[in-house]
């Protein structure tokens, strides 16, 4: 069966499980990589500057 009836079965299994590297519940089972740290996609930890809030124009780390 495909189409609309199949979409009701999408919530049975979890999309994300706990990541081995960062420990957060962000590892996508189907895609095979972590949305938080990038484990499974790259050796480098996924990190962006916009993750930290700017205060007075200076970026806090």
UniProtKB/Swiss-Prot annotation:
PROSITE patterns (UniProt xref): RIBOSOMAL_L37E (PS01077)
Cofactor notes: Binds 1 zinc ion per subunit.
C4-type ZnF: 19-37
Swiss-Prot/TrEMBL GO biological process terms: translation
Cofactor(s) of this protein: Zn(2+)
Keyword annotations: Metal-binding, Ribonucleoprotein, Ribosomal protein, RNA-binding, rRNA-binding, Zinc, Zinc-finger
Pfam families in alphabetical order: Ribosomal_L37e
Keyword Metal-binding on entry: yes
Binding residues for Zn(2+): 19, 22, 34, 37
CC annotations in GO: cytosolic large ribosomal subunit
GO molecular function (one): rRNA binding
Family named by the database record: Belongs to the eukaryotic ribosomal protein eL37 family.
Cited function: Binds to the 23S rRNA.
Name used for this protein in its record: Large ribosomal subunit protein eL37
């Amino acid at each position: 069966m495909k189409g609309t009836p199949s979409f009701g079965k999408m919530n049975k299994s979890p999309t994300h499980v706990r990541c081995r590297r960062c420990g957060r519940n962000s590892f996508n089972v189907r895609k095979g990589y972590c949305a938080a740290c990038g484990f499974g996609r790259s050796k480098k930890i996924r990190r962006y500057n916009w993750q930290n809030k700017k205060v007075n124009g200076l970026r806090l780390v």
